[in-house]
Regions:
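Membrane-spanning beta-strand positions in outer-membrane beta-barrel proteins
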Residues: 30, 66, 112-114, 149, ...
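Detector for outer-membrane/organellar transmembrane beta-barrel domains
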Residues: 37, 90-92, 167
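Predominantly the C-terminal beta-signal and adjacent terminal strand-loop region
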Residues: 155-194
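C-terminal transmembrane beta-barrel domains of outer membrane proteins
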Residues: 139-141, 153-155
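Extracellular loop and loop/strand-boundary signature of outer-membrane beta-barrel proteins
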Residues: 40-43, 78-84, 130-136, 171-177
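Cleavable N-terminal export/targeting peptides
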Residues: 1-25, 194
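Gram-negative (and chloroplast) outer-membrane scaffold detector with strong preference
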Residues: 56-132, 141-144, 161, 183-192
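Short glycine/proline- and aromatic-enriched beta-strand/turn motifs that initiate or cap beta-hairpins
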Residues: 19-61, 67, 117-119, 184-194
């Protein structure tokens, strides 16, 4: 008889346990629009700043883990003594981890810190890229971007990104090492999509 009572108790409690298993937070989807400034180095060792912007779509799906896709465009009018400019568009995607915390006080704000590693392609144009045959005005190369940032939410659907910093590695042909390491800084607005 005790066995029957035990089975009946398990059957009675089973729906509550199953209901608890089904309740989970829906994925968070963010769209960030940022101004970006990129510090790069030309072949002769001279440095330059490129300015532009980016649009980034990210989703957090499980305990801070998620993914991001970033499309950025930057332009420098003069990267070398000869006056050659550079326009670069990068399209990268990859994993992201986000840690969030609610700040207590008069104004309750949610702060989120994120770190990411994104890979993709960089398209350089309006410049000079050496090649075995002749110089070209554009090139498509591998791009690796890693870094992170801070988001400060003011409401459920709106946040600001006071700082984002990324290291960007590209492999444009330059007649020397064919490797460029740049730092990209950004700040802007984040829209949290329902």
């Amino acid at each position: 008889m005790r066995f029957v009572y035990a089975v009946m108790t398990v059957i009675a409690l089973l729906p509550a346990g199953l209901r608890a298993q089904q309740s989970y937070a829906h994925p968070e989807l963010d769209l960030a629009v940022t101004y970006s400034a990129q510090r790069g180095t030309a072949v002769g060792g001279s440095s330059f700043w490129a300015q532009g912007g980016s649009a980034e779509l990210s989703a957090t799906v499980y305990h801070g883990l998620g993914g991001a896709m970033d499309i950025a465009g930057n332009r420098a009018s003069n990267i070398s003594p000869s006056g050659v400019g550079l326009t670069m568009i990068t399209t990268t995607f990859g994993p992201r981890y986000t840690w969030s915390h609610t700040l207590r006080g008069e104004f309750q704000k949610r702060i989120s810190l994120f770190g990411q590693t994104l890979i993709g392609e960089a398209h350089g144009l309006d410049s000079t890229f050496p090649s075995p045959a002749a110089a070209q005005s554009d090139a498509n190369v591998f791009a690796l971007q890693t870094g992170g940032g801070v988001d400060l939410a003011f409401s459920r659907h709106f946040a600001i990104r006071p700082l984002e910093a990324n290291w960007l590695r590209t492999q444009f042909p330059n007649g020397a090492s064919n490797i460029q390491n740049s730092l990209r800084f950004g700040s802007g607005l984040v829209f949290r999509l329902p």
